[in-house]
Amino acid sequence: MRADLADWIALNMVRGIGPRTANHLLSRYGSPASVFAASRLALQKEGLKPETIQELQDSSILEKANAEIERLEKLNAQVITLEDDEYPDLLREIHDPPIALYVRGDLQKALERPALAVVGSRRCSTYGVNVAESLSRDLASHGLTIVSGLARGIDAAAHRGALESSGQTIAVVGTGLENTYPKEHKKLEEQIIANGAVVSEFPLGTPPLPQNFPYRNRILSGLCFGVLIIEASEHSGSLITARLAYEQGREVFAVPGNITSQTSFGPNFLIKDGAKLVQIWRDVVDELPREAKEKLFGIERPAAAKSSVQPIFEAVDLSDGERKILEILSVDVPAHIDQLLISSEMNSPDLMNALLGLEMKDRIRQLPGKSFIKRI
């Protein structure tokens, strides 16, 4: 632990000092300790408000920082500062990088691989969840680290897809690390910590304030070589992430959607505006920087199969009943078990055996209410 860690944490905790002001003060004074030692007049000349100056010159802020360090230890978390070697190189390049990153898990290990942000709507379709899980699973299995925001919908699906392939995933959250949001993602968060990292720029006890979530999006894109958008409405925060990615010189990818769906507006607009259309994992991998491809595959790109277009579904090793069910199911509209019983003209035991076999082969997924959907 660096000797001046409390100074960095304290500067990050001062109300009225965001990343832009903090970076300016550090460039002006050289270190957090020098900022705290500056005179009131000098700080006034920097344009700081009286209440911010008062907090900077109140010794209690350092007491709070030291208490924060004790809480970090209990949480098995760490803070990486802008001056630390462990600070992510790509993130350091962006405008207004966070001066301190709160981390649970192994961020360094997760970022040894090229990272891709996968984001989208919280209110997404079943198809969107299916696509997010499938693409994230395939990308993680080919060596990419999946970065998302731990939110409901597409974010959670992206994390789960990466975890299904035993891949690495990073959650960039809009709360302090002592708070899980949403609360039902506590188990998912712990799985991410065990297979990647959870990252925040906010002090430990920060609640899920609405303004925090668009604010953290620059970190989502800043950690990655590119951003993939899967379902986003016209006013979705995912479009903020895409804009930030463009500003940061990152690649922007999008999965096209149904033109009549509100959640397809974002990706369809981005594709029209020049984002790269994604249908399969290779569409992303082909855009990796050369050095990243060589690191992952030992060659410029992964070896191609005989056909460059792979079938999404293969009917190998399936029983006649399983094939029949797969033909009935779709990837976007769930089918209730009663509907399958009628459409398949199978008896109940045969239908249950077919569904069980398809689930074990990871070809379908059961949804709440005894409904089923085909996996991509």
Positions of PLM-derived features:
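Short, small/acidic-rich helices and loops at N termini and domain boundaries
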Residues: 1-85, 361-363, 368-370, 375-376
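Glycine-biased, small-residue-rich flexible motifs in mid-sequence functional cores and linkers
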Residues: 1-4, 73, 81-376
